[in-house]
């Protein structure tokens, strides 16, 4: 090794020891001919001092981020010169020998200053030298190790599934890879290991996991990455409770890394309850504001706006003091979400109701409204009226905005909840309207994916009454973020074919695209289920950062662009020719025997 000690490991107990350190010049200060350098390596920072001799002469040319090796004696700093903000603040190293391992060009940004994200990603190798980004990547490694330890204890088998497979045009868009040896044909990068892990269960592996790289060619959305990571788990001969029990053990081990003890069992909430109370299937439970249903309260109203299928309200504590400009801004906020506006009533300090809606209410409605919704003097009541789904979604979003504006969220709190009993199917129009890519060609598509089992009570009726069928699925939510989701899978061919039929996938198409899975189900496929955790989001939460880009070593920026390597980039004419990217595939008689990968798992 070029060094004897790590810079961040030195303490007063090592005084008078001769040590050799390596690292980068973080800061340089000259004081009357004495040069002080903050030397940084992965472990931390030590102050090194050049007082006299050849080493001190050399030190005059040191600049920020020079890579150096120093040898010297550990000394206790003089009284009054200690820096108790860092672990090494009681000592310094009196340097006797200096070797410059490599110089540094002028920096595009100072590492101890704020920098724009584009510059940080373009020079990510410099950004990673900073304490925050470096800590996030090291934390991610600990997260991986903690999960592996739990799963190894339970005798899970880590299996690598293929990353070159076949495209599924009905799923989310795939990244395609030309097959040079079969011009005109393409592999697809997997959106998840879903079907392969199910085949592992058929193969008798019984307990599988993988820290899996997944790929989705999606339109740009904030804080999404085209390549991402999930902890993928599958188990045979289990029910929902078994998977949840293991998942809670994994999560507990992860949150212990940041000193938090998760109280288990984690509470469960049905999808219907989450939507009714919070307007979201991933509710943030760190604050207590809830939606209040008002359709019954306004059943005899003469106010046409409230003569709707659904009328609901959410209270903004202290919101009555908002200026008119802010109340108008709420209307624009609602319109950006596809609503016509956000009706409101202001509750005065004397209990009287104000605002444009109040004058349209009857005396009886005005007298009972505050009590019905739980509003106090000084509060603002926001309303949504229309279809149940869209109105609840608007109020749920307003609930989150209220919490942020009124500082209702404890930033140090952790609130976990399982959301269970979601619908098995949703109208295809709803899925496409929300930006999802619907699988199948009928009026119904899968909420999770096509391989999720119906709940036992829905097995006999899900194809005759798709709108009422419940999924044998479970999502884990932390602080309003869905950090994982899974389900008990279909393991019987007849049930899988019935699900495909509901989704408008014909028998012939199912055989062509998923025949290998259907064939496998015919050979004693065991009951099985699993879960996939969003590894980037979990690590971001643990690291206390807002964006998943902060916990990915080399992330993409907006639109999937990599500022560091300038990827994606055009390929040469020779590469196009060799790859066969422009070739038309030859017709194949056995095309129906080729099989696809599946949509992303939850």
UniProtKB/Swiss-Prot annotation:
Binding residues annotated for ATP, in chain numbering: 216-218, 225, 482, 534-537
Subcellular location field: Cytoplasm
Low complexity bias (residue ranges): 590-602
Catalysed transformations (reactions): tRNA(Asx) + L-aspartate + ATP = L-aspartyl-tRNA(Asx) + AMP + diphosphate
Region (Aspartate) residue spans: 194-197
Keyword Zinc assigned: no
The keyword Protein biosynthesis appears for this protein: yes
Enzymatic class: ligase
Extent of Basic and acidic residues compositional bias: 575-589
Site (Important for tRNA non-discrimination): 31, 80
Keywords per UniProt: Aminoacyl-tRNA synthetase, ATP-binding, Cytoplasm, Ligase, Nucleotide-binding, Protein biosynthesis
Gene3D superfamilies found in the cross-reference section: Bira Bifunctional Protein, Domain 2 (3.30.930.10), GAD-like domain (3.30.1360.30), Nucleic acid-binding proteins (2.40.50.140)
Pfam families: GAD, tRNA-synt_2, tRNA_anti-codon
Sections of the chain in a coiled coil: none
Domain of life: Bacteria
Location of the region described as Disordered in the Swiss-Prot/TrEMBL record: 559-602
BP-aspect Gene Ontology terms: aspartyl-tRNA aminoacylation
Gene Ontology terms, MF aspect: aspartate-tRNA ligase activity; aspartate-tRNA(Asn) ligase activity; ATP binding; nucleic acid binding
EC number: 6.1.1.23
Entries under NCBIfam families matching the protein: aspS_bact (TIGR00459), PRK00476.1 (NF001750)
Family (UniProt): Belongs to the class-II aminoacyl-tRNA synthetase family. Type 1 subfamily.
Task performed by this protein: Aspartyl-tRNA synthetase with relaxed tRNA specificity since it is able to aspartylate not only its cognate tRNA(Asp) but also tRNA(Asn). Reaction proceeds in two steps: L-aspartate is first activated by ATP to form Asp-AMP and then transferred to the acceptor end of tRNA(Asp/Asn).
Subunit composition and interactions: Homodimer.
Protein name: Aspartate--tRNA(Asp/Asn) ligase
Protein's organism: Rhodococcus jostii (strain RHA1)
Gene name for this UniProt entry: aspS
